[in-house]
């Protein structure tokens, strides 16, 4: 679905583990990495689209994860002009995304990128929480930063949150 402003309705998915790391996926046949994401079909809610994309791209179901949060607002990015398909109707100039933070509740061996009809990814790894913001393609960077900032306090392991909340005495 494309909205009246030319943005494709989409979901972004951040999967975290119990160590505060996030799932980082390598795009099929490319050297670029990103979070799982995908379009919202007509008649689908963002949550339904998220679970469909999660299964198609990562092979996980609603039983394998727990929803920790979803973004308060839709986050948008524009595509570089060279990536816009000007001959398509309607023209899509970017993505309008609802983001979800999930916690993996199953063994990571259940991750299977071959479940969908055409795989989106051919590799993955756990990375530190803020790593994706520095590594994602530049036109997605601001949306990643905003989503990750919104989810940060919920994704960090409890111990790290507790330490960050302590006041530090200054000397001198």
From Swiss-Prot:
InterPro entries: Nudix_hydrolase, NUDIX_hydrolase-like_dom_sf, NUDIX_hydrolase_CS, NUDIX_hydrolase_dom, RppH. Keywords: Hydrolase. A motif (Nudix box) lies at residues 38-59. Its cofactor is a divalent metal cation. The keyword Hydrolase applies. It is an enzyme of class 3 (hydrolase). It holds the Pfam family NUDIX. The keyword Metal-binding does not apply. Signal peptide: none annotated. One of its GO terms (molecular function) is mRNA 5'-diphosphatase activity. Residues 6-149 form the Nudix hydrolase domain. One of its GO terms (cellular component) is cytoplasm. Its EC number is 3.6.1.-. PROSITE patterns: NUDIX, NUDIX_BOX. GO terms for biological process: mRNA catabolic process. Accelerates the degradation of transcripts by removing pyrophosphate from the 5'-end of triphosphorylated RNA, leading to a more labile monophosphorylated state that can stimulate subsequent ribonuclease cleavage. Belongs to the Nudix hydrolase family. RppH subfamily. This is RNA pyrophosphohydrolase.
């Amino acid at each position: 679905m494309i909205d009246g402003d030319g943005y494709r309705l989409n979901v972004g998915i951040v999967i975290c583990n119990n160590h505060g790391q996030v799932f980082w996926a390598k795009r099929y046949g490319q050297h670029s990495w990103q979070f799982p994401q995908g379009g919202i079909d007509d008649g689908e809610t963002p949550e339904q689209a998220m679970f469909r994309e999660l299964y198609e791209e990562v092979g996980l179901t609603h039983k394998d994860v727990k929803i920790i949060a979803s973004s308060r607002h839709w986050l948008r990015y524009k595509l570089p002009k060279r990536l816009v398909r000007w001959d398509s109707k309607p023209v899509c100039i970017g993505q309008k995304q609802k983001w979800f933070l999930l916690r993996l509740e199953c063994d990571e061996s259940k991750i299977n990128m071959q479940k969908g009809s055409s795989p989106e990814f051919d590799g993955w790894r756990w990375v530190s929480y803020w790593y994706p913001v520095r590594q994602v393609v530049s036109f997605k960077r601001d949306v990643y930063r905003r989503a990750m900032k919104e989810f940060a306090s919920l994704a960090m392991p409890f111990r790290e949150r507790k330490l960050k909340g302590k006041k530090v005495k200054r000397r001198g």
